[in-house]
Amino acid sequence: NFNAILGKTDPGRMGFDAVHYNLHKTFSQPHGGGGPGSGPIGVKAHLAKYLPAPLADREEASDGGATGDGYRYFWRNPENTIGKVQQWHGNSGAVVRAWAFYRRYGRELERMSEHAVLNANYLRHRIMQGAEGVHAMPLDGAPAKVVKHEFTLSMSPLKEVVGVTAKDIAKRLLDYGYMSPTLYFPMIVPECLMIEPTETESKEVLDKFAEDFLKILGEDPELVTTAPHTTDVRRVDEVLAARSLVLKHPFDEE
């Protein structure tokens, strides 16, 4: 996940030979709602000959090439390829979109990362300042002076005092019009919420989120544990949904 380090460093300088890149968020792809996500693999030159086949390549064409840009495009197999793997082409639409996004913003992507880090640190400190009427303040999931583009909070103190869990907080945030943060990840943080404001949000939005978040921490526990209350679909039985796999999707012709 590159959202904090664009323009600052790269995997090669860090000593990696092969890296899986997440294209969601940092490179324009949606994260929630099932995607479409994509995770292309990048390798150093000495590993290129082992890459799965086929690879797209091009060569100069004296006749102008099929596309009229002076090149002829073709498939090729690396010298010591491991062969074709499942879904070798990846999510091609997501890759092209990410490439276009990267080319469009260029060096401005470095500023994007700077804003993402600034927003995450500001929101973290804004929440941890607390407010009157809060039943119990969360714990910092990873105590550090500075975080990168995201931070974690443990809602264990709130659970111990009034029985409200991280999941309850996430569901209640839906009533306030927010998309729920990542739940219970990483698992080393008990009752974990991972909050990632990204670079797009203004200070006013971050202040409002912090205000609403702290307000929820002081609400009637029963109101929070039975949330959401304003969404079309209320709290679902997740255990039943996991064990009874029935997919229902409305189609236009219906």
Language-model features: locations:
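Non-catalytic terminal extensions of PLP-dependent enzymes
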Residues: 9-12, 59-67, 71-85, 101-254
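PLP-dependent aminotransferase class I/II
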Residues: 86-97
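Conserved PLP-enzyme active-site core in the AAT-like
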Residues: 1-59, 65-70, 80, 164, ...
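Active-site nucleophile and cofactor-binding loops and adjacent substrate-binding regions
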Residues: 31, 90, 184
